[in-house]
Every structure is written in structure tokens, then in C-alpha cells.
Design a protein with these regions (language model features):
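Short beta-strand scaffold segments in enzyme catalytic cores
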Residues: 105-109
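Short, charged amphipathic recognition helices of the HTH superfamily
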Residues: 32-42
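Single, function-defining residue in the core of a domain
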Residues: 1-34, 71-73, 87-90, 101, ...
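Active-site- or DNA-interface-adjacent structural scaffold in DNA-acting proteins
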Residues: 27-30, 44-100, 154-155, 168
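Amphipathic alpha-helical interaction segments
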Residues: 39, 56, 289-293
Length: 379
């Protein structure tokens, strides 16, 4: 349920009772797929009163040593070392998600068409983040990823040339999408990016141009591309990417990876753990996100292992042969494997009876039981 190499990290910072409670909570998250405290307390398998379980959960989320630096980063650093060699290129996406009065700024590393959260902060305001908030969180991540080549990806909220200049000073690569009305100076003439004349299927690379009419930022490269119509779909507008890469292809290919963090947010919300249903704020929410991050990465790794074994067809609908995009992510496979195994354990006697009634299908059932054993070994 929790990787063995992570057990030692947690046991160094948690008491044995706290460690066991965390393991229970991760297991509950994988099966109920809901982070509302009442729903977690309902499913928490402790033989005490419901209200006692709820208060126990609240006290756990109030425990200060449960934080990113001590209980998350050691395992994440180990995982990154396992999946990327030293000096490898790591794509990290900076993005913000919000609902109600909650506003979260997060940086994640791109992995397997999804993203792993590295660091996050709760903004005490509504709306966009500012440069100070962006550079503060990015500096922590850049220092954490020392020894790797970091590429920072950001959408139009993070379009500021000030951020681009700061990233240049940190000696990291970046791809920051620009708004269409951003001004660039080309051949001594100022133009808005949308006035460059791009049409679907066209691309353009502006080398070392001034971006915005404000002074003191130096020059940047701007990669421009408007994707052609494909399968009846055409983007409404072109992409304009502020970057320190030297080609359109490299810039666009890198920026496309940014959408993996949006898939991750979808997994954390309605596609997985229903984060928006959480009725907690402040430090409790911060630590709840930490629990979700542990559960999310754990399920993703388990799903990847199940896919490598070729057993995903026992957990979810099989992929179509001619379909270019995957139907299910490794996270989806891992999360739903927990549900399948859990139901088998709860209904084992009934299933055994059904198998005896349908004896002509016993060879298929035996294959399924073997698959169940192998899948259980990954969880």
C-alpha cells in the first residue's frame, strides 16, 4: 500500500501509531475516493465511535511535523532518482487551481502523461498569483531538483517577462505562454503577437526580441505556432511561447507537457479524490493535500506496475487497437485496482459460490484469481 522505501522515511518522523494511522488513511482514500473528513471517518476501520474517529482525524491533520519537507520530499527525491538519471531534463509545471475561497499554487514534475506534486502553497486571496509568490515556490523546487536540468512550464497567468528574466538568472529553461495582445519589437516596430499574421498550420520563431514595452528585462525568444485542423478540430488561436529554447519544435514540444498538470488536477478533483468536497482550510487542507499526494503517487506507481504485467484488462476496459490516445492512465488503473481487490475481499464467499455454479468457466476464473494475486502483490 505504501512503498517500502517510503516506510523508513515516515517512521523517522512519525510515531508508530501515527504511521499506522497514515497507512489506514491512504487505504481509505484509495477505496472511498473522497477526502471529505466525514466520509473518511465513516470508512476508517477503527472500532471506536464515529465522532471519536472524526476527532482523531482532525488531530492528525493538526500535527505540525506532517509537512512537505520532512514527510514528502525524501520519498519524492528517491522516486525521481529512480526514474531519471542525474542531469536529466525534468519538466515542471507551475499552475494554480481554485474553488470557493480556496486558492492553491502548485509546482509538479511531469511523469507518464500526469504530474507528481512537488510543492504547493495556499494563497490567502482570490485570483491570480503575483511574481513574489511564483518565485518563492519556484526557488524551493529548483533547489530541490538540484543536479537536474529543469524546464519550467506555465500558462498565461505566468506570462510576465519579469518571471522569464528571473528564471534566466536561475539558469533554468522555461516555456511561458503569452497573451495575444503582448507587444514584441520586430525590426524596430512594435506589434501585438496576434498581428504577426499566423494562420492554422503556420509557425514562426522570433529570436532575441523585446517583449512588452517595459524596459530592463533584456531580450527573449518567442515561439509561435498555430496548429492545423486535425480530425475536424482546430485551435481557436495560436500559441505564443516566451522561452530561452532556440527552436519552435523544442519550445512547442516542451510546452505541450504542461497539460499533464491539468490532468493531475482533474484526478485530484472529480476524477479521483474529490478534493473540492473537502471542508477544511489552512494547515489542515495543506496536510490533507499531502495525504492525497501520497495516495496519488502510490496509485500511479501501482497502476504502472499493473500495466507492465499486462493485467490492466482485469481492472478497466481494454484499449482500442487503433486509438492513438490512452483510455486509462496508470493512476486510474491503480485506483480502480484497489476497488476490485477490496470488493473481492469483502464478497469472497459469494464469489466462490458463483464459481462453483459456473464450473464450465473455472479455467477463466483461475486465470482471474491468478491475476488478482499478482495485482494484490503490487498494492
Amino acid at each position: 500500500m505504501i512503498a517500502k522505501e517510503y516506510e523508513s522515511v515516515l517512521k523517522n518522523h512519525l510515531s508508530h501509531a501515527q504511521y499506522l494511522l497514515l497507512v489506514l488513511l491512504i487505504g481509505v482514500l484509495q477505496t472511498v475516493k473522497d477526502v471529505k473528513l466525514e466520509h473518511i471517518a465513516e470508512a476508517l476501520p477503527l472500532p471506536i465511535l464515529f465522532e471519536s474517529r472524526r476527532r482523531k482525524l482532525q488531530r492528525f491533520l493538526d500535527w505540525q511535523p506532517l509537512n512537505i519537507e520532512t514527510c514528502w520530499w525524501p520519498w519524492l527525491k528517491s522516486l525521481i532518482a529512480q526514474h531519471w538519471p542525474p542531469k536529466a531534463v525534468l519538466y515542471v509545471a507551475l499552475d494554480r487551481t481554485s474553488w470557493s475561497c480556496i486558492n492553491i499554487l502548485m509546482v509538479s514534475v511531469i511523469w507518464n502523461h500526469r504530474a507528481w506534486p512537488i510543492y504547493w502553497t495556499l494563497l490567502d486571496k482570490k485570483g491570480s498569483s503575483n511574481l513574489a509568490e511564483q518565485t518563492t515556490i519556484l526557488l524551493k523546487v529548483i533547489q530541490f531538483l538540484e543536479g537536474y536540468k529543469v524546464v519550467v512550464l506555465g500558462d498565461r497567468e505566468f506570462c510576465s517577462p519579469k518571471l522569464g528574466k528571473w528564471l534566466c538568472e536561475q539558469k533554468v529553461y522555461f516555456c511561458l505562454r503569452q497573451k495575444q495582445n503582448t507587444n514584441v519589437q520586430q525590426d524596430s516596430v512594435w506589434l501585438e503577437l496576434r498581428e504577426l499574421g499566423l494562420t492554422p498550420g503556420m509557425s514562426l520563431f522570433l529570436n532575441e526580441v523585446n517583449v512588452t514595452k517595459q524596459q530592463g528585462f533584456g531580450t527573449f525568444n518567442v515561439a509561435c505556432k498555430w496548429k492545423r485542423k486535425y480530425r475536424g478540430f482546430a485551435p481557436d488561436e495560436a500559441w505564443y511561447i516566451l522561452t530561452n529554447f532556440t527552436s519552435v519544435e523544442e519550445s512547442i514540444k516542451s510546452y505541450q507537457k504542461r497539460f499533464c498538470i491539468e490532468e493531475m488536477f482533474r484526478d485530484l478533483k472529480e476524477g479521483g479524490y474529490s478534493l473540492e468536497a473537502a471542508k477544511v482550510e489552512g494547515d489542515r487542507l495543506h496536510r490533507l493535500i499531502l495525504l492525497i499526494a501520497i495516495a496519488y503517487v502510490t496509485a500511479s506507481l501501482e497502476g504502472k506496475t499493473i500495466q507492465k504485467m499486462g493485467l490492466q484488462k482485469y481492472v478497466a476496459r481494454p484499449e482500442k487497437e487503433k486509438k492513438q490516445t490512452r483510455r486509462h492512465s496508470s493512476f486510474y488503473i491503480g485506483l480502480h485496482a484497489h476497488r476490485w481487490v477490496s470488493q473481492w475481499q469483502n464478497q469472497q464467499e459469494i464469489v466462490q459460490e458463483i464459481m462453483q455454479i459456473n464450473r464450465h468457466k473455472l479455467p477463466y476464473y483461475r486465470k482471474g484469481l491468478r491475476a488478482m494475486e499478482l495485482i494484490q502483490s503490487t498494492l
